[in-house]
A protein has these predicted regions:
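Cytoplasmic membrane-interface "Motif A"-like loop-to-helix N-cap segments
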Residues: 66-76, 268-281
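Cytoplasmic helix-loop-helix junction between adjacent transmembrane helices
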Residues: 100-138
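Conserved MFS/SLC helix-loop-helix module at the cytosolic interface between two early adjacent transmembrane helices
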Residues: 55-91
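Helix-to-loop junctions at the C-terminal end of transmembrane segments
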Residues: 56-68, 259-272, 357
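Extracytoplasmic gate region of multi-pass secondary transporters
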Residues: 24-25, 208-253
């Protein structure tokens, strides 16, 4: 298979496998009303997807050091499909919904990084960083399509129908990869315990820097994606929106695709660490600006694409930097640690946003939305400020 066909196949399969990714955020106001959920309970529901990811990623990603990543990807599509179908057939309250969301999140753990591993194992060329950028930016396409289809199907046929569709499409992705992606036998490496290999990877300072950056990135990204529809729904109570909240959310997510690709190009052509630092500072400031405009729909709609582009401008740069700092023997373990940290933050962020909303006056309070949105960028600002302090702090006088 040519490199072009390979990247096309894996990007298409990734987008299909993510059909359930934004289903809960897109339908969160409906689910809150149906099951009478508070903001923090809604945050738990949104975060349970990433809890399933975190529980599964260490094993599934590390497994790609020993078996063909294609096989792990197929397992992931099965979990993603079964989780959403289980939500369709059996979810009836917060606990059951969280359970099936966790299964769906485990499916992402089996598709996203293992899919990237399947790609990088088959493309060892100087173009690899660009292929990585295309693959990681497809995450945004999958998220946008999930928002759009979940919102449209949920509005037209009811929320259960949206989860039914979200369960079918990952199974189709698995079928395509099973039929079209050639199997590959990985080079055998000495078998060490999963935790030992991940600890060895984490002791690498370059890997550790990328993991910390990814934690801050995912805190902001997944907190934003979990609550953007609810934020726009609040804005719509202040003044009429030009489109539905889910349609605007889907369009905003599309801005992340060119931002991720162009951000990686900037990192390749310049200083990667400096690029990531600038992006984190920008997104941290824009997080507070987004919250400030929450009660002014037109200004909010204007700033959201800029903010989301800033969130995504370091995504591919971080991932490509991680891959560049690993070798074939430890890449799976490094990806496991990287994903565990990032998606662990992605699990906590939606919950913390919900807690802040409840504590600061609820989802009808402008102050609550200011604090909630500002909290999304706090770790990017902390990390960037710490890096700048280390770089420019005066040496102690002796």
């Amino acid at each position: 298979m040519t490199a072009f066909r390979l990247i096309l196949l894996m990007c298409f399969a990734e987008a299909l496998s993510m059909a359930g990714f934004s289903a809960v955020p897109a339908l969160l106001p409906v689910l809150q009303n149906t099951w009478h959920l508070s903001a923090w309970q809604a945050g738990v529901l949104g975060g349970s997807y990433f809890a399933g990811y975190v529980v599964s990623i260490s094993w599934l990603s590390s497994l790609t050091d020993h078996v063909d990543a294609r096989r792990v990807f197929l397992l992931g599509t099965a979990l993603a499909g079964l989780g959403s179908l289980g939500f369709y057939f059996l979810a009836h309250d917060l606990v059951s919904a969280c359970l099936f969301q966790a299964v769906t999140g485990a499916g992402l753990a089996g598709t996203y990084m293992p899919g990237l591993r399947a790609l990088t194992d088959r493309i060892e060329t100087s173009l690899q960083p660009r292929f990585i950028a295309f693959y990681t930016s497809t995450f945004g396409i999958g998220a946008s399509l999930s928002y759009a289809f979940s919102g449209w199907v949920g509005t037209a046929y009811g929320w259960p129908a949206a989860f039914c569709l979200a369960g079918i499409l990952p199974l189709l992705a698995g079928l395509l990869v099973w039929r079209l992606l050639p199997a590959q036998h990985p080079v055998p490496h000495p078998r060490l315990s999963m935790f030992k290999t991940q600890w060895v990877a984490l002791k690498n300072a370059e890997i550790r820097r990328h993991v910390l950056g990814y934690c801050a990135h995912c805190w902001e990204l997944f907190g934003f994606r979990a609550w953007i529809v609810a934020l726009l729904t609040y804005a719509g109570t202040q003044s009429e929106l030009p489109l539905s909240a889910t349609a605007i959310a889907a369009l905003v997510n599309l801005f992340g695709i060119p931002a991720s690709i162009l951000g990686n190009e900037a990192a390749i052509r310049g200083d990667r660490h400096r690029h990531i630092l600038r992006v984190m500072l920008a997104s941290g400031v824009l997080a507070w600006l987004t919250g400030f405009f929450a009660s002014t729909p037109w200004l909010l709609i204007a700033v959201l694409p800029v903010y989301f582009a800033a969130i995504m401008a370091d995504s591919a740069a971080l991932t490509a930097g991680l891959v560049a700092s690993t070798n074939a023997q430890n890449r799976g373990s490094a990806m496991a640690v990287y994903s565990l940290g990032g998606f662990g933050a992605g699990f906590i962020a939606p919950v913390m946003v919900g807690v802040l909303l409840d504590l600061a006056g609820g989802q009808k309070s402008a102050l609550a939305w200011l604090l909630a949105c500002g909290s999304l960028g706090v770790w990017c600002l902390v990390l960037a400020t710490h890096t700048l302090w280390k770089r420019f702090a005066p040496s102690p006088i002796t």
